[in-house]
Amino acid sequence: MLELRLVQGSLLKKVLESIKDLVNDANFDCSSTGFSLQAMDSSHVALVSLLLRSEGFEHYRCDRNLSMGMNLGNMSKMLKCAGNDDIITIKADDGGDTVTFMFESPTQDKIADFEMKLMDIDSEHLGIPDAEYHSIVRMPSNEFSRICKDLSSIGDTVVISVTKEGVKFSTAGDIGTANIVLRQNTTVDKPEDAIVIEMKEPVSLSFALRYMNSFTKATPLSDTVTISLSSELPVVVEYKVAEMGYIRYYLAPKIEEEEDTNP
C-alpha cells in the first residue's frame, strides 16, 4: 500500500511541468526514503533525476518498494485539475494497475478523486556516479532562464566557459554572435540573488540550447540553479525542490564537428 500526502500540492504540479516535455513515460519509484524518478528523454541525450524525500510529505506510507509507470502528459492533465492551494494525496495498492490522485481544498469543503491507469515501462536504472566537477556555478534561476531564452534567438548552441574572470555564455548564428558574462557577486541583500563561482579548473563546453531551455521549465521550483561542469562529464543543472529534494538534469556536451574533419 502506498499513500503520500503533500500539503504543498502546487510543488507536484510544478515538478510535472518541468519534466513532461522532456520525458513522455516514466517510472516513479517509491521506497521508504522517498519518491523518485529517473528517465532519459526520447532521443537519449538528456537524463532527468527527481527526488522527493519522505520527510517532506505530511504523511508518507510505502509498505514495500513500488514502481509506478505513468504517462507524464496524462498525469499533468490530472494535476492541472488541482487548485494551487490544494493538498494532494497519491494512493496505490501493491500489485494494482491504477493510481489515485486525491485533491482536497484547504478548507476541506471540496475533495476530488482522479484515478489513472498505470503502464508497464521497461526502464534501465542508470547509475549516476558521484563526480568531482571542475567548475560549479550558482546563480539566480530566472537569470539563467533569461540567458538561455535570449541566446536561443541568435543560435542553437551555447558555449559555457568558466575562467577566473567569471562565467561566459556565448552563441553564434546566421545573424551574428552573443556573449553574456557574469562575474561572481556575493555582496547582495538576498542570498538567492548571489552569483557564486567555484572553479578548480577552467572549462569551456558546448550544449544544445533547446535542452537548456527545456531544463529552465523548473525555474518556478527554486530561486537558485546550480550548474556543475567538467570537461569529461555531462553538465548537471540542479534545482532544489523546497526543503524536500531536487530535480537534476544531465546533458552530454556537444562535440565540435570541426575536430572530426581535421586530418
From Swiss-Prot:
Subcellular locations according to the entry: Nucleus
GO terms, biological process: DNA replication; regulation of cell cycle; regulation of DNA replication
GO cellular component: cytoplasm; cytosol; nucleolus; nucleus
Annotated organism of origin: Arabidopsis thaliana
Biological classification of the source: Eukaryota, Viridiplantae, Streptophyta, Embryophyta, Tracheophyta
PROSITE patterns (alphabetical): PCNA_1 (PS01251), PCNA_2 (PS00293)
SUPFAM superfamilies per UniProt: DNA clamp
GO MF: DNA binding; DNA polymerase processivity factor activity
Matching InterPro entries: DNA_clamp_sf, Pr_cel_nuc_antig, Pr_cel_nuc_antig_C, Pr_cel_nuc_antig_CS, Pr_cel_nuc_antig_N
Pfam families named among the record's database cross-references: PCNA_C, PCNA_N
Stated family: Belongs to the PCNA family.
Source organism superkingdom: Eukaryota
Identification of the protein by name: Proliferating cellular nuclear antigen 1
First-listed, main subcellular location of the protein, grouped into a coarse class: nucleus
Function summary: This protein is an auxiliary protein of DNA polymerase delta and is involved in the control of eukaryotic DNA replication by increasing the polymerase's processibility during elongation of the leading strand.
Assembly, per entry: Homo- and heterotrimer. Interacts with POLH, ATXR5 and ATXR6.
Gene3D superfamilies: 3.70.10.10
